[in-house]
Amino acid sequence: MSTLRDHSNNIRKNIIKMVAEAKSGHPGGSLSIADMLTVLYFDKMNVCAENPKMADRDRFVLSKGHAAPALYATLAEKGFFPEEELITLRKFGSKLQGHPDMKKVAGIDMSTGSLGQGLSAANGMALAGKLDNKDYTVYTISVSYTHLRAHETR
């Protein structure tokens, strides 16, 4: 059974491999959130790789989209797609580009790019969940590492 430390170490290793293979990217910003993503995806969040659009899943928005390698490595570690795909980061035709794209990668709840836009999107998701009486939590990481909670009735 893997521990949070094991998951975090694998995620960090894959971030370095991806950015090195791509010869571009933001390793510092990605490495800085590896532990947070590990705790969220392997301890806190209700997500399912086999059913990534599950209605009452928790949502995650990476507002600092340039740290996408961390999110990709986490999603692969969680089983959303094969780890072997990680080395296609930023390659022509790859679904793993420099910023997350919710239409191309299972497990991504919001496409992000411009710094800060994800915070307002996460706020809208949380409000929609509250208005619809849904039981999910919305998390976001922005440049200031903001944590946004929707509501919990669990």
Question: What is each of the regions a protein language model found here?
Answer:
Residues 146-153:
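Conserved small/polar residues in nucleotide/adenosyl-binding loops
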Residues 142-143:
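Acidic, proline/serine/threonine- and glycine-rich low-complexity intrinsically disordered segments
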Residues 1-139:
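Thiamine diphosphate
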